[in-house]
Amino acid sequence: MALADLALSNIWGGLSSDFKKKNFSLYGQWISILTIFLCLALGVANIFHLGPIIVFSIICIVQGLIVLFVEVPFLLKICPLTDTFVNFVRKFDGNLPRCGFYLLNAVIQYLSLTLQATSLLVVAILFTISSACYALAALKHQEYLKSSLDVTGTGSGGALEAQVGEHVVRNVL
């Protein structure tokens, strides 16, 4: 129970410290993380529709997995992936590239409305909001930042990617 409380306090602490920075790229990142869960859940839920909407639900699941690798970069180091995919994901390491990436994902999901109105519309709207956050960050010339979520509980407040690297070193030694 204490471990769960520590994890929740670290998540809420990281979330609140990110929102205090008033940087739109952090807002876009948190919205994108929420979108990952919705892509997977709504993609699976819409697979059970009969007809061509199944294609968009499969695309939604794939989008959720790609966004997972874009927004949680340490997964690129711990998962066995091809260099082509890793280089593709690293192209979105900035405000404008992410704005375009999420806008493209939103357009793909908005196209599902041509077949049938489903809950995939929620994913399209969240992709649009995330794209808008990254666009605002670029327009305001805000630095591209990554979340300061502290999953280790060390209080370092460092990047999530660096924290995982520390654990890997500890486990090896």
UniProtKB/Swiss-Prot annotation:
One Pfam family, short name: Cg6151-P
Compartments it resides in: Golgi apparatus membrane
InterPro entries given in the database record: TVP18/Ca-channel_flower
Biological-process GO terms, alphabetical: vesicle-mediated transport
Regions crossing the membrane: 28-48, 50-70, 96-113, 119-139
SMART domains: Cg6151-P
Protein keywords: Glycoprotein, Golgi apparatus, Membrane, Transmembrane, Transmembrane helix
Membrane topology listed for this record: Multi-pass membrane protein
A single Gene Ontology CC term: Golgi membrane
KW Glycoprotein (keyword) present: yes
Domain of life (superkingdom): Eukaryota
Glycan-linked positions: 23
Entry function: Golgi membrane protein involved in vesicular trafficking.
Assigned protein family: Belongs to the TVP18 family.
Descriptive protein name: Golgi apparatus membrane protein TVP18
Species whose genome carries this gene: Candida albicans (strain SC5314 / ATCC MYA-2876)
Name of the gene encoding the protein in the UniProt record: TVP18
